[in-house]
């Protein structure tokens, strides 16, 4: 069951203009592994903030072979209360893993249909130094509202 839920609206419906020309780059750095990728945004109605779900790529882990930094990743969560000007780290999605051992979650997408929230995400068992692995899409749902 997906432990985190939200409601989507437009990020561009802002009270004040956001000067993208002078925005910090990057807009968010994951404090755990540094390299967030594959973001998707959802509006959290209870907390009145945007939540970003992303691949928590292990960019700052030393001595990994080849592309191993993109394996072993969880779904990270960051949030903003001011339409993306400042982000803070929330944690990781508490997703049950389809298999035991350290696995990989890539490129989450979260959406709502009626009263149910869904996450679809790529799952790969294990950590690999080269591109490959037995990739599959896994599907999580939740009826909990936050």
Regions found by a protein language model. Give the residues of each.
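Bacterial N-terminal signal peptides
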Residues: 1-8
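Carbohydrate-active catalytic/glycan-binding domains of CAZyme proteins
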Residues: 13-145
């Amino acid at each position: 069951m997906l432990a985190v839920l939200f409601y989507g609206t437009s990020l561009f419906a802002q009270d004040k203009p956001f000067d993208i020309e002078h925005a910090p780059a990057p807009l968010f750095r994951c404090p755990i592994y540094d390299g967030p990728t594959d973001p998707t945004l959802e509006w959290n109605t209870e907390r009145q903030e945007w939540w970003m779900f992303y691949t928590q790529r292990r960019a700052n882990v030393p001595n990994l072979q080849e592309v191993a930094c993109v394996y072993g990743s969880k779904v990270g969560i960051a949030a903003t209360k001011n339409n993306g000007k400042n982000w803070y780290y929330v944690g990781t999605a508490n997703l049950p893993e389809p298999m035991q051992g350290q696995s990989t979650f890539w490129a989450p997408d979260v959406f709502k249909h009626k009263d149910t929230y869904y996450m679809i995400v790529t799952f790969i068992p294990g950590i690999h130094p080269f591109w490959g692995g037995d990739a599959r899409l896994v599907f999580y749902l939740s009826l909990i509202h936050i």
